Amino acid sequence: MTEAMKITLSTQPADARWGEKATYSINNDGITLHLNGADDLGLIQRAARKIDGLGIKHVQLSGEGWDADRCWAFWQGYKAPKGTRKVEWPDLDDAQRQELDNRLMIIDWVRDTINAPAEELGPSQLAQRAVDLISNVAGDRVTYRITKGEDLRDQGYMGLHTVGRGSERSPVLLALDYNPTGDKEAPVYACLVGKGITFDSGGYSIKQTAFMDSMKSDMGGAATVTGALAFAITRGLNKRVKLFLCCADNLISGNAFKLGDIITYRNGKKVEVMNTDAEGRLVLADGLIDASAQKPELIIDAATLTGAAKTALGNDYHALFSFDDALAGRLLESAAQENEPFWRLPLAEFHRSQLPSNFAELNNTGSAAYPAGASTAAGFLSHFVENYKQGWLHIDCSATYRKAPVEQWSAGATGLGVRTIANLLTA
């Protein structure tokens, strides 16, 4: 590999010859990033994206001013799904270097897992990768159970089984227990539930190509909560947390579920399927029932659930929904501390009743009369959370994946949200 390009930081503006808007300049010693104090982390990330665009694949972060957050901002912009890159990191104190190394290990795992093609990453592979990551950081403090295929039906996981039965690759439920207490009877502090749809064709409510071409990333919620648990463990999480990943393909076949089918869940709820492309909520319902049964203080589910959230927020924010104002405030405070983008969207009691069905208690999608799709999706999920008004957060992961590069990000997964959830778990 070529000699490293030195990247230094300066609080002085660039020479006037570079223009008044210049955020970096080039000299004989390398490249200098000119920080202005307004959005230094964003400036570093955008500059790193430009440096990668120049074809520079080996850099050395040099000089004063670098800390773990600034190094991480550079890497977020510099990393891309194609090619190899090498960064020589600056000298950091032990705590900051450990924090940076943990981000590189875990959040890069999240990005790489979401970017993996569906042919490589099916439901079973996703579950096993999650087990491997958590076991790597937690060792013998972890136990897990994987339930798949017809065993799901036999055990009453009808949402997950129904959605996944149309694929040759069996649907899978991962139930993982991180218990650092050593006490098998220790209370469960939190449950994390992730949507793990490893490819979403839309089923018989089939997607157009322009909406299907990124659907390998529809397991982004599962990857995010897995990464969050792993990252929280590296930050010293000392409470019992359970992880439920609901993993399946949503495909078309002679055995696939159909419009008008009715699913009966273990909590007695009957759901009429009127859109097979609203499958994420059907699989999450099974995970939320299991999570509620643990009686935890906190339930967080994460899912690339609706296009409506992306319409509202683009790919710039994750959408947050909760009936618990205090808990939502804590999550937003964690997001601010970690410099990650979350935005709260409305969720009210009336959203729970905006899913009418002529044949069942619930419809899996709102009608044209109720167009607040992200809020009605959250309302649907609330029917499967035993105490939905307290201790439950729903994250619609609209910032998980970008179909095209922008000034701060390459195309593909971002890893956003991992640090925020981990922060909340360890607060």
From Swiss-Prot:
One GO CC annotation: cytoplasm
Catalytic reaction(s) noted: Release of an N-terminal amino acid, Xaa, from a peptide or arylamide. Xaa is preferably Glu or Asp but may be other amino acids, including Leu, Met, His, Cys and Gln
Localization, UniProt: Cytoplasm
Catalytic activity, EC: 3.4.11.23
Enzyme class: hydrolase
NCBIfam families for the chain: PRK05015.1
Family stated for the protein in its record: Belongs to the peptidase M17 family.
UniProt-recorded name of the protein: Peptidase B
Native organism: Escherichia fergusonii (strain ATCC 35469 / DSM 13698 / CCUG 18766 / IAM 14443 / JCM 21226 / LMG 7866 / NBRC 102419 / NCTC 12128 / CDC 0568-73)
Taxonomic placement: Bacteria, Pseudomonadati, Pseudomonadota, Gammaproteobacteria, Enterobacterales
